[in-house]
Structures are given as structure tokens and as C-alpha cells.
Amino acid sequence: MVSQPAPSESSPYLEIAKKEKIKIDFRPFIHVEGVDNKELRTQKIDLSHFTGIIFTSKNAVDHYFRLAEEMRFAVPDTMRYICQSEAIANYLQKHIVYRKRKISFGEKNFADLLPLFKKFPSEKYLLPSSDVLSPDITKTLDTANVDWTRAIMYRTVCSDLTDINIDDYDMLIFFSPQGIKSLQQNFPNFKQETTKIGVFGNTTLAAAEEAGIKVDLMAPTKETPSMTMALEKYIKSLHK
């Protein structure tokens, strides 16, 4: 089982399933719930006080503009947008007229944004985020020495998985520490035994190990930068 939503028809997961004659089920172990404007106000956040916004995900984009609308805040055309990736920057078009706006983006990792913060150091930045924030983000922003404020605009919560028989699966694949938490919350009596566990990212690995779970498959690595590559390599190793 892959703890993500079902992918499109062209997904590498579906290609692996067909090629290796295995069955892959998709089920998100976590989901996002937005905070309301009342809760945002308790964080002492006034959207009009900021001249720049830092977006690290599409969820952050959606919930920022949702709350802006709820609070009747008209986002000014002069707002500067710093996006972690080009995909997130392009996603802004869902909410704003992209042309003529002050939009910049990095390659992939948050640390890649450091030159942009040095280029635009005088903005007062708002960071819309979930209740879980990577320490890399805090470290990069503090290194950049810019004026920034975090606003928790949505929360990552455990989904209800009680309709699943978790023991039916030979392998479970996780992409976040919250996914591991959801496993424990939904299946408090889960015993790993012969169940193989795959994880993506060091923080997910750490969460699994902390929960006493043995990890059999890890990505990204130099050889397997994606989970699908790691999974295919693992399956092929079983045939040897």
C-alpha cells in the first residue's frame, strides 16, 4: 500500500504494478484541514502587515488565499511572492493574474531560496504553513536574516483508516512522519512481523525508527532518487 492519493493513469507506480505483476493500493494516511480566520487572529496575524509571502506548497497557496477572502483582505498587486519551486509559482495562477506580478522561485529545496532573500532583504515576509514545519526552513530564513513571521493556516491530521485490514498488505510505503503517526493512531495493535516498510525522506525514516519500525526500503538515495525507482529495485532484488 502506498500512503498517497491514487495517481493518474501514467503513474510509474501503475507501470511497476503491471510490469512486476503486483497489486498496489493507494490510500492517503493523512489529510489537510484549514484553520478559520478566528484561529488565525489568535496568532496575532494581520495579513496587511506583510509585503512578501513565502510559499512552500500548493496547500499553503490555497489556504492563504482562502483566509484572505474570508478576512476580506484584498491582496495588493505589489505583493512579492517567493515560491519554493516553479510548480508552486505556476500554481499561483489559480488565484492571481500571473503577469506583471513580483514572483520568484527556487529549484527544489528551500535552501535554494537563500539568494532570493538576499536579493530582496527589505520585505516583511509571511510564511503560511501547516502545524508541522521543517527545521530546514527556519534555519534558512534565520541565515538569510530577513523579517519573517510564520502563520499556521492549515493542519495535517490523521485520516480514518479503520475500514482497512492493515495485515492484508505485504508492504506499506510512507512519505512523512505524520503518515507513521497515522499508522500508530489507526492501528495501535499493529505488529510489523513480515510486513515490509518503505519510507521517503530522513524525517520519515527517523519517525519510523522512533516508533520501533524496521525500514526495508529507503528513498531518495543516489542510486534511487524516487520512491518508484527504489520500489522497482527492491522488487527485482527479490527475484534474484
Residue ranges and their predicted role:
Residues 1-240:
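Conserved beta-alpha
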